[in-house]
Amino acid sequence: MAHKKGGGSTKNGRDSNPKYLGVKAAGGSTVAAGTIILRQRGTVIKPGVNAGIGRDHTIFALVDGIVSFRNGRNNKKQVSVEPCC
């Protein structure tokens, strides 16, 4: 028989903080240079033309333009920024 009843509950009750990952600027939306387009863990989606990648794999716009998602080489997803104006 157990002599300590409350031990199990102390091993539970913790939760990690939200990381707010995902697409921040949808395809077809207008972005300014430096705008974050996508936050991700690892390069699930690769940067294309006029899109840069940060050290935490964040993809951002290098120029003002319109966001475009497409399938690139080897069926890998890719995000580009098409310059406008």
Swiss-Prot record:
Keyword Ribonucleoprotein found: yes
Protein name: Large ribosomal subunit protein bL27
UniProt region (Disordered), positions on chain: 1-21
Molecular-function annotations in GO: structural constituent of ribosome
Keyword list, A-Z: Ribonucleoprotein, Ribosomal protein
Species per Swiss-Prot/TrEMBL record: Chlorobium chlorochromatii (strain CaD3)
Pfam families assigned to the protein according to its UniProt record, in alphabetical order: Ribosomal_L27 (PF01016)
Family in the record: Belongs to the bacterial ribosomal protein bL27 family.
GO cellular component: ribonucleoprotein complex; ribosome
Gene Ontology biological process terms from the UniProt entry: translation
